[in-house]
């Protein structure tokens, strides 16, 4: 049987890094940051701890790498959802749905963004603010275009929608609401969001705005 060190020498660096991130994701989502140890991650990856430190200088570096991946993925899926249609009501449904799809993913990566146990760390705070701000910018651009509201007001509305999506998705994924089917939860929250945002007068814009549901 190959030793941990022998197995570690057989994998290209990029592939090894991806493997370590997968192992760390499993350990962090199971134990949380504070209870997880680099030994746990090395064991989960089937390597020695010195090999792990060749790729990541500390447990925090490893955690931040995973947080960056999760934040980037959430921004990406929301942006794709917003860009998937020109119909405003459908945009709301798609954007809200993106948050629910994110929290229902088997990878558990949403916990890095929504349930981090390192929110007191400045480097984590900056990343969490960035992901909310980036998503709000995407949504605010659509609101400003369609309603002619000033940029500051559009951004405030967008941040509010992000908060609605995030908190409701976190609640839905908890055991308290596990009985609500995913599609039903998405539609409920999208309808609430649309009934609010559709109350603002539209500019002379070609987009239709049928009420979802």
Label each region the model flagged:
Residues 17-18, 38, 60, 64, ...:
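Short, structured helix-loop boundary elements
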Residues 102-105, 109, 141, 158-179, ...:
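Amphipathic C-terminal alpha-helical segment
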Residues 94, 101-140, 148, 156, ...:
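Short secondary-structure transition hinges
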Residues 16, 59, 66, 70, ...:
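Hydrophobic/aromatic residues within well-ordered alpha-helical segments
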Residues 65, 79-108, 149, 157-161, ...:
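Hydrophobic alpha-helical connector segments
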Residues 72-75, 122-147, 155-160, 167, ...:
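Amphipathic alpha-helical packing segments from all-alpha helical-bundle domains
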Residues 19, 23, 27-61, 65:
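Helix-turn-helix
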Residues 1-15, 201-213:
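N-terminal intrinsically disordered/low-complexity leader segments
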